[in-house]
Amino acid sequence: MKTTLVKLFALASVVLFTGCAQLTMGTPQPTAENTTNLKRANLAETRLGSFTLEAGKPAQMDKGHSLRGANTVQAPTNGSFAEYVRESLRVELAAAGLLDPKADAVISGVLLDSQLDPSMGTGKGSIQVRFTVTKGTEKRYEKALTARSEWESSFMGAVAIPAAAQHYEGLYRKLVGQLIADPDFRKALAK
């Protein structure tokens, strides 16, 4: 009887500490580092094309990730992680004065992979996007970039769930930073 009560208490504690919530990532904001790097790169103005999920991938990969039990994280951009990549890049380009809806150069992207694992011990997340830069009919850049993160993930869901969402959101800034730093990308948009 005592063992059963202990197990029941443990199960109730797990349910209580994990709860259930639908977390929406914050609206992308420009970072000082990415904006500065864009301004220093001497790039031509550009516009953004479509950002979509790769054909054949499960739609859920673009919609949300489970965070222990009934908790989920989703993007504020029409519920699409691909659109969140686009918006993350858009705010950086706009902050650097490089966004022009009439520009010849177009940046587009395809979400190839999106993973989030908030397991106890070590949490992990990654996103992979294939970016393309075209000017007119000429493809000037095409490359898949991946951003990864690992963090200490608490046993307690009340700590681990927001931490996982925060680290996952940070991957988008990191990915945009990788794109901006890529010499081939800079060459494709050089003035």
Task: Explain the meaning of each model-derived region.
Residues 75-99, 109:
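Mid-chain, structured segments of secreted extracytoplasmic proteins
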Residues 63-78, 138-181:
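Short secondary-structure boundary motifs at beta->alpha junctions and helix caps
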